């Protein structure tokens, strides 16, 4: 059975999809990828040392390191990790981790399972949904709880769910169920 079957049957109801008045079913927006970036409260060295392991545990798949240039230095900044040009070198880990395919589906099932229990601010953009998973997310995930010493210095994970939607309204319509809490109230969300 498709891991997100419940999401498509219970959250993405057909009446919502029909409101889009799409001529072709291939035009219905879908999920492209999930981007995950850890934010820490301690030193930059901690990110290099333990961040890789934390990402492997959280994502459920091995972290793949990309090739560096011949100089071994990069001066690109990453606003998610609050890194900047003064630090000189930005490791491959400082760049966001991207999930696609089966790993993405499994991680999304986990997110959808606990999001209604967490108090996260959700931001809907043109073709993406952005939110932060605080450390309280560990309480709902046994493998994170078992390795809490690795996660104790990570303040949160910034998560971006990228869709193939063309407008913010399409994204909001398709993911409106994602914003519902168990008690019937809605998540706090904002537009850019």
Curated annotation (Swiss-Prot):
Cross-referenced InterPro entries: Ribosomal_uL5 (IPR002132), Ribosomal_uL5_dom_sf (IPR022803)
Keyword check for Ribosomal protein: yes
Main location: mitochondrion
Protein's GO biological process: translation
Keyword Nuclease among UniProt keywords: no
Top-level division of the source organism's lineage: Eukaryota
Subcellular location: Mitochondrion
GO terms for cellular component: mitochondrion; ribonucleoprotein complex; ribosome
Entry keyword set: Mitochondrion, Ribonucleoprotein, Ribosomal protein
GO molecular function: structural constituent of ribosome
Gene3D superfamilies recorded: 3.30.1440.10
Protein family membership: Belongs to the universal ribosomal protein uL5 family.
PANTHER family, per the entry: 60S RIBOSOMAL PROTEIN L11-RELATED
Name the UniProt record assigns to this protein: Large ribosomal subunit protein uL5m
